Amino acid sequence: MALSSKTLKSTLFFLSIIFLCFSLILAHGGIDDGDEEEETNQPPPATGTTTVVNLRSKSLVLVKIYCIIILFFSTFLAGVSPYFYRWNESFLLLGTQFSGGIFLATALIHFLSDANETFRGLKHKEYPYAFMLAAAGYCLTMLADVAVAFVAAGSNNNHVGASVGESREDDDVAVKEEGRREIKSGVDVSQALIRTSGFGDTALLIFALCFHSIFEGIAIGLSDTKSDAWRNLWTISLHKVFAAVAMGIALLKLIPKRPFFLTVVYSFAFGISSPIGVGIGIGINATSQGAGGDWTYAISMGLACGVFVYVAVNHLISKGYKPREECYFDKPIYKFIAVFLGVALLSVVMIWD
């Protein structure tokens, strides 16, 4: 019974992913979706830009509002789901690697190419601004992670120092052994969640998750066509669902008292972060148009590329989800296949871009 229940949950989740993929392909393949806007807004060559898109289009803004709703509820429900049932470890392991491949391909094939093309349209061909901004986005994201890790490590040392004089030697050994087992679960930020015991420390690390998510949401808000918005939604929501599930599992281990209430609070914070980023992106588009809008879009896409590459490589692919129990698929070859399938899927979808 338990096995069939797990299989049913995994099957339903896979069907959801297939539905999202189908919606994404329709968004790219339909000539009436984003192409109509692009065709009706083709600029004269004298403007110095390759395309001029109506970023204030009601239909485009409406699609982004749909993205906000879908992002929030998918992330929030995924975050609280571990409280009600246990997820399949193999599914989370391979799903995280798959989303890492999607993220990596999105950064390099979509964001970086769009930023570079826009800079070329702005007559800036001598210097590789797009690649420089991608490197800057990578470094900024790494700096944020380093800052959070530094604060969390210092707080963790304080907790350990305070407990040494109050615990017996046998208790210390038991705590260390239990810690080793618990640290094996969750995505890397969730691992840090498990190492902390204070409300402030946990809130800080949730803030780190939200920091990444806001920048990811900005990528949706800055989309200049409806097809771009749907594609970015699919890419980001896929990653956030797995991250939210891992976060929920870590919180249940971390908070033995009132776990449901705090899990709901943290899941809400994590779920609302990307919609906030979408709103910021919509606001940027509403205040910039023409050459100024092109500059804003190119710079933002360049930085977003760096953020996505960092999240894909350091959070999803290299560390990923660590099963709490021995898992048959926890092998490099299966992880490679999952990442490769993610890259291949996004590469095929981009044919219709």
From Swiss-Prot:
GO molecular function, one term: metal ion transmembrane transporter activity
Induction: In roots by zinc and copper starvation.
Membrane topology: Multi-pass membrane protein
Superkingdom classification of source: Eukaryota
One cellular component (GO) term of this entry: plasma membrane
Signal peptide: 1-29
Membrane topology (Extracellular): 30-59, 112-130, 223-235, 285-296, 353
Family stated for the protein in its record: Belongs to the ZIP transporter (TC 2.A.5) family.
Function description: Mediates zinc uptake. May also transport copper and cadmium ions.
Miscellaneous comment as given in the Swiss-Prot or TrEMBL entry: Zinc uptake is highly pH-dependent and no uptake is seen at pH levels below 5.0. Inhibited by copper and cadmium ions.
Protein name: Zinc transporter 2
Naturally occurring in which organism (per UniProt): Arabidopsis thaliana (Mouse-ear cress)
